Each structure stands twice: as C-alpha cells, then as structure tokens.
Regions:
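Rossmann-like NAD(P)-binding element
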Residues: 1-8
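Glycine-rich, histidine-containing beta strand-loop boundary motifs that form or position
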Residues: 3, 26-27, 50, 78
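Alpha-helix N-cap/helix-initiation motif
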Residues: 4, 50, 237-241
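Short gly/pro/ser/thr-enriched loop/turn and capping motifs at secondary-structure boundaries
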Residues: 8, 29-33, 52-56, 81-84
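Rossmann-fold NAD(P)-binding glycine/threonine-rich loop
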Residues: 10-13, 17, 21, 25-48
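Short amphipathic alpha-helical segments and helix-helix/interface helices
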Residues: 12, 35-37, 61-65, 148, ...
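Adenosine-phosphate binding glycine-rich loop
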Residues: 42-82
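C-terminal catalytic/substrate-binding lobe primarily of soluble NAD(P)-dependent oxidoreductases
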Residues: 66-286
Length: 286
C-alpha cells in the first residue's frame, strides 16, 4: 500500500485475513501498532514502514550498531527537500501532505536517558552542516519505526529528526499552533499543497550516527549519502520517489527470495543492510 496512512488498517486486516503478504510506506505509529498486533496470528509477512523513514534509515542505523560491543547513542536524520528552495518555507510537497502534517503533529517516540518516552514533534531543534550547506533538524513522529521497542533499556539515547532548510520548523509551528490550523488539517493541507507543489529537482539526505564502545574504546560510526533524481528505464524519477519506492521493492525482493521470514510482523531493523543492497533494486542505493 502506498495510500495515505489512515487507509492502511483495513488493507492490512484484509491481507492478514487472506493470508497474503503486506507491505506499506506508513509513518503512522498507531497504524504500525495495529499491524504489529495482527502479526501474532498472520500466516504471511506483514511489513509496514518500508519507505525512507521509517524504513531504510532504520536498516542503516541497525547495521552501524553491529560494530559495537556496547551502544550509547543512535541518532538518525533524513530530509527530502527541493534542491533549489525558494520562499520562507523552503519546502516542496513531493510526498503525501497527509503524511507530512501527521508527522509534524503527533508526538515522537524516543529513548532519553535510557527510558522510552514520547516527545513533542517540531521540537529539539539542532543545526547541521552538510557539505557547506546549513540545515536544521527537529523531531517528527514515526521515523524510528519499531527501534524504540528494540533498543529500550539497551541505549542511553535514540532519536529521529527530520532535516529541513533553516526557518521551516518555526513557520510550521506558527501555522499549526498560533493560527490553530492543527485543528483543521484539511485546510492546512490545502494551503500547503497550493503554496508548495512538487518540484522535479529534489534531493534526499540520509544521515545516521551510532556511538558506543569497541574493545572498551569509545568510538563513532557514521553513514551519510545524498540521493538525487535518476533515470530508470528511460523515465526520470524524483529523488523522493525512487528512494521510497526502491526501499519497499528491495524488501519485497528479499521476502520473495526467502532471505527474510515468510510470516509474521517484520521489523525494518531485522533486514540486513548488506542483503538489502544485494537486491536488484537495493543496488540503486550504492
């Protein structure tokens, strides 16, 4: 399912009842919890969150942890942005406005001081410099998938933040909380979609860092890549489009090849990054 998050529960239920594999791109926490509960009695694979974040970023973050004897911090960052921004929002809605608004409004899961908790979205601002370009990052919901469940009690810090051009988060807070548009999501969606239509030239930034101890020495591992539009079989794909689609298709290829479990709920962090990259579609990320 590539449908908006609020349509996925009945589709997942139908897949469960019919015993067929299910994959989606949802970032919605409650939808994922619903599907996770279905997984206990599923005779086929139920794999939500197969996009970028949640999805690929969790696979990458988990892969970095294998270098450590003990993990201290896991910090994951993803941004899908116009390559040539304009206006104060400096953004373009190249994916579901429903999803963007949902992840800006809902609280985000995180682990802080070893404890799993919920933190407000559009908070925790930090500034990032990527190859000389300044960005901001702030908390948004859903990006960690099931990682908080996996690492609760095992790490001091685990968080996910969305990368944006500076000033974007403050303006979104103004729209949602000062103008109270958080209570009228349909109007907010219309305003944003009309003001910031999709662009052809976009970029996806993927950044993950893990800190911990190797042989009693504190060290740090990082992954960073910027993905741009590419041509696939004669058709140009936006960066957000092909990276999202390829993340999902690579997981399908792994299930079809028997590399992954054939039934039950599938966590993204259970997918080996090396095997992911070895699939025909996953190889696009090399």
């Amino acid at each position: 399912s590539a449908l908006p998050y609020f349509l996925n529960k009945p589709i997942a239920q139908l897949a469960h009842d019919e015993g067929v594999h299910y994959f989606d791109l949802t970032e919605d926490v409650s939808t994922t919890k619903f599907i996770q509960n279905l997984g206990a009695t599923s005779e086929a694979v139920l794999a939500p969150q197969c996009g970028l974040a949640p999805g690929l970023i969790g696979i990458i973050g988990m892969d970095l942890t294998y270098s450590f004897d003990q993990i201290r911090d896991i910090e994951l960052r993803v941004g899908a942005l116009p390559r040539y921004p304009n206006g104060q929002l400096a953004y373009s809605f190249t994916w579901s406005p429903h999803g963007v608004i949902n992840e800006y409004l809902n609280d985000a899961e995180a682990i802080h001081n070893g404890q799993k908790k919920f933190v407000p979205s559009l908070e925790g601002f930090e500034y990032i410099n990527i190859e000389g370009q300044e960005f901001e990052a702030f908390t948004t919901s859903g990006g960690l998938g099931t990682l908080c469940d996996t690492f609760e009690g095992k790490v001091d810090t685990l968080n996910y933040k969305t990368i944006r051009y500076p000033g974007h988060g403050k303006l979104m807070r103004f729209l949602m909380y000062e103008l109270i548009l958080k209570n009228d999501k349909e109007q907010l969606e219309r305003i944003l979609s009309n003001a910031k239509p999709p662009v052809e030239e976009d970029v996806v930034y993927v950044y993950a860092v893990v800190e911990g101890w190797q042989n009693k020495t504190l060290s740090r591992k990082e992954y960073y890549k910027a993905f741009h539009p590419i041509e696939i079989e004669g058709k140009k794909w936006r960066a957000i489009s092909w990276t999202t689609a390829a993340s999902l298709v690579a997981v399908i290829e792994l299930v079809a090849a028997g590399v992954l479990p054939q039934k039950g709920f599938l966590k993204q962090e259970e997918i080996p990054f090396k095997k992911f990259l070895e699939t025909p579609t996953g190889a696009l990320f090399l």
